């Protein structure tokens, strides 16, 4: 049986502190577990850094990057995350969104066809 491919999950954030924990938990609790989580913050001013720092020692979190200055450009954040990604697949998971816990379990096999 083939090993499950690694999925790199990039979470770009700017001032979404109120959603961050739920978003990150909706990723970490996926039924598909071969993931790396890349957390990015674009110089938030709402305390998002505190939430992200709670995950710094989590085994699934490969990177937490905190910008000192806001880029004003989400595409720069996406690109930064893609450069860090080691997975076969990359999922840009916006910070103010949620997903079903079976999302990756359903999507990865379709991409593998």
Regions found by a protein language model. Give the residues of each.
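Nucleotide-sugar donor-binding/catalytic module of glycosyltransferases
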Residues: 1-113
